[in-house]
Curated annotation (Swiss-Prot):
Protein name (database record): Glutamyl-tRNA(Gln) amidotransferase subunit A
Protein's organism: Novosphingobium aromaticivorans (strain ATCC 700278 / DSM 12444 / CCUG 56034 / CIP 105152 / NBRC 16084 / F199)
GO MF annotations in UniProt: ATP binding; glutaminyl-tRNA synthase (glutamine-hydrolyzing) activity
Quaternary context: Heterotrimer of A, B and C subunits.
Biological processes per GO annotation: translation
Amino acid sequence: MTNLTDLGIAAIRDGVARGDFTATEVATAFNAAVEAAQPALNAFIVTTPEEALEAAGKVDADRTAGRPLGKMAGVPIGMKDLFATRGTQTTAASKILEGFMPEYESTVSQKLWDAGAGMLGKLNLDQFAMGSSNETSAFGNVISPWRRPGDTAPLAPGGSSGGSSSAVAARIAPAATGTDTGGSIRQPAAFTGISGIKPTYGRCSRWGIVAFASSLDQAGPMARDVADCAIMLEAMAGFDPKDSTSLDMPVPEWTANLDPDMRGKKVGIPREYRLDGMDPDVARSWEDGIAWLKDAGAEIVEISLPHTKYALPTYYIIAPAEASSNLARYDGVRYGLRDLPEGAGLQDMYAATRAAGFGPEVKRRILIGTYVLSAGFYDAYYTQAQKVRTLISHDFTNAFREVDVILAPTAPSSAFALGEKSADPLEMYLNDVFSVPASLAGLPAMSVPAGLDRNGLPLGLQVIGRAFDEQGVLNAGLALEQRARFSARPAKWW
């Protein structure tokens, strides 16, 4: 019999529906895999084996009774610890929220439970989703299941959704939720050889997700392949009146309309993404992707996104500005950590709580954000950044008059070793160079594994689409997936 932990969403759901195995057997297998891997990978902050089994039991009972099963029936997933889960600790990987038990469920997680999914646990991440390597978590680094051949140095799983990427790549979860503000689904997916999609801004509700940068944050799925991402995204997406930025649009049937035939489609190759000193393996992978989409029938068109060079500085003004505003609410009064020095007044308590609760990277971004929003600098920085953001969005609008999707690398390199870049925040921020532009424009974008580099580590290719055209992104992703035939898995060392 196939090892149940080798199965993805579609295989589990369909196998449970056919009676090949029970949802309880699947949950039991993944619970055991999580327990075995957690000490080495640290992918989870909290594990919830009982919740996975309870959800599985309901699915098995529904099947026995002949009741209809949901899109995710019998699939146990990892939930990024940015999503509020009723009665289960939600921390955003920060000490300031340690022990916080929400009395409500995020819209996205509730939709997944309604579709028949169960929860294996809350996944580790960069603190408040601020980071590209999962080194800023207050609960320890997540370790990638991948290693360079002959080398035991622990590698970064990407970030901020590093717990999600590590768990899916290590086969201890068939899928996981992620959030993407400037690349936090796509970059970790690329680093670990899995697929992940950031949908159009507003496609998935932000209600109940701990906010980082509210005009950028978007939830999405991370899974073994493109089809599994489509299935999970259908379950996650949908209008939510509790989120003022939610799109009041029906959820398309992305899975039923998956089609890798690219005939009649034009694929844009942005010349500004060809950076000086680009990693030769990344450049080769990009050329492979161009050839694969051409083979699938697409016409390749070189395009220009002239304001690309301003995307990173624009992002690192807007995102910290929004973060400094969002994180002002954490004061130790109603929930989470409270640091109350003896004889302290209210303002002293605020300062002590925030000093003890926030990590260095979060403090750095709060300081940057507060600075660019201050009276003397607001127009010089924040207002200018918003103007440039509009120009970047217009670049994409103009490009999509000529082409249907855009192909680019997901990240400028494969996974790096933990500690390799953490001493230099600016070097770490450069990891987002290919992913940030689509985020600023609110466009759907996904990463698909494309092969291995010279060190035997995964590389990802990124497909960017028009707003609301997740179907076009998924279809191009499927065309790449079928031609890349990526089947490499990390050698098990944990």
